[in-house]
């Protein structure tokens, strides 16, 4: 899957963005990279689902399908990931954006685990 390759590349860039200095510019760049990586995650999930005759119409249905495939643990709370993604779509600076920025490391770990699971299933 070429889309999986793009997703993994974006994950690497997200990790780099998170590790940058804690300036307004770098925070904005990290949040933008999170948005892009999230979109690629969904695109990748949909590609795998389509191969198996499944259609994910919503973000929630995509992550539920991933959980059914056991690519994420049942305890994984992906709903925070989805909620934070939706919040940054509004893109307002302030406390909420700062909170999401602080959660990016957790979101990265979840997305990275998902990417690793997809890679193993592909092989």
Regions found by a protein language model. Name each.
Residues 1-123:
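Solvent-exposed interaction patches of small proteins and small membrane subunits
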